[in-house]
Amino acid sequence: MPKKLFIRTFGCQMNEYDSDKMADVLNASEGVIKTDNPEEADIILFNTCSVREKAQEKVFHDLGRVRHLKKLNPNLVIGVGGCVASQEGDAIIARAPYVDVVFGPQTLHRLPQLIAERKAKGKAAVDVSFPEIEKFDAMPPSEIKGASAFVSIMEGCSKFCTFCIVPYTRGGEVSRPFNDVLTEVADLAAHGVGEVTLLGQNVNAYRGDMEGTEEKADLALLIEYIAEVPGIERIRYTTSHPREMTQSLFDTYVKVPKLVSHLHLPVQAGSDRVLAAMKRGYTTLEYKSIIRKLRAARPDISLSSDFIVGFPGETDEDFEKTMKLIDDVGFDSSFSFIYSPRPGTPALELDDSTPADVKSARLLRLQKRIDEQAQAISQTMVGSIQRVLVEGTSKKDVHELAGRTDNNRIVNFSGNPRLINTFVDVRITSSLSHTLRGEIVIRED
């Protein structure tokens, strides 16, 4: 009987991708299969996120909840991977001595060896090093799960914003070779994938080596080549940094219709004083200039962003500037949070005296404004025909289908389940608070 693996994933899309790769590695080496039930698992892995303190503490809480399973099954392997593992290393074993393996984002491919080392030596195995591109070279082929797939094209971050722990937990920016990415995309397309999402902490900083030349490919060139892969109908990329938005990338929105009309471009704040304290490397005017260029290239582009509320020293005036930026840009959605101090980051040394209730009130105001804007944008889509990738059944009604539009909206509609993992045309009939409703359009050629 094959061994079973349970994985709990915290955090970003990169972590979701990494969790899939953990499963692929263990399946290829030992025939391990996934389970949704930790109580029947032979291996339990936590793929962690350290961007915010709450997510970090949740990991140790969840570790405590599976400790009893170790007593019931002494052969159970418990592992901690991801950014908390990279940050804490051996300290995880000190705090939770029943953990067997600790590995970082760049060493997940070594999982089989780490598990074998744990069993051979009788003590926890820890590897949180940064072996750059080795991880990708050691990966087995991906398991194809549908018509949409993530493709990691680079790792790490070299920006060192004062609030962010990612450069310390994932290392500096490292890009995969250009041809390696194209080969993976072509393989995915050959197995029925029609939509790819290119992943990286700063994905638009991609600079991949090209065979036969000393030149490096940027994200714009990579997208142009991916668009030529037979079977690929839609291309996304995330997450971007404003400092890496180039004219060649703006031009790609004109040249490549398969590149979606949606971009997640974190701004974090609308005050130049706060942006400087964060060391983001741009001003609000420069950010708005980027938005103007994007909309000149793709007028209907939908924009989402990240916001940190209550950064040390943020005044009421600073926050009002953020609200003005939200109005000026017309963001479609956001990931917005109250500032969470991270150990080892420069912002930890800044005065953080803003009362918690003030921070909470600011966050609620910001989220309400963006929700209002999102609903207004959704309303303008009513009556339009949207190309939708059918992802599965609706979360609220299993008798309906749910899919995603080019501009990243969820649409629920009636249809045959055989349409799952295909593209269909849907007329939007109504707009709800967070989703759209529609009906399939049969085109007459």
From Swiss-Prot:
Chain positions recorded as [4Fe-4S] cluster 1 binding sites: 12, 49, 83
Enzyme nomenclature, EC number: 2.8.4.3
Ribonucleoprotein recorded as keyword: no
Named cofactor requirement(s): [4Fe-4S] cluster
UniProt cross-references to PROSITE patterns, sorted A to Z: MTTASE_N (PS51449), MTTASE_RADICAL (PS01278), RADICAL_SAM (PS51918), TRAM (PS50926)
A Pfam family annotated for this UniProt entry: Radical_SAM
InterPro entries: Elp3/MiaA/NifB-like_rSAM, Methylthiotransferase, Methylthiotransferase_CS, Methylthiotransferase_N, Methylthiotransferase_N_sf, MiaB_methiolase, rSAM, rSAM_horseshoe
Residue intervals of the Radical SAM core domain: 143-376
UniProt-recorded Gene Ontology molecular function terms: 4 iron, 4 sulfur cluster binding; metal ion binding; N6-isopentenyladenosine methylthiotransferase activity
Residue intervals of the MTTase N-terminal domain: 3-120
Family named by the database record: Belongs to the methylthiotransferase family. MiaB subfamily.
Official protein name in the record: tRNA-2-methylthio-N(6)-dimethylallyladenosine synthase
Name of the gene encoding the protein in the UniProt record: miaB
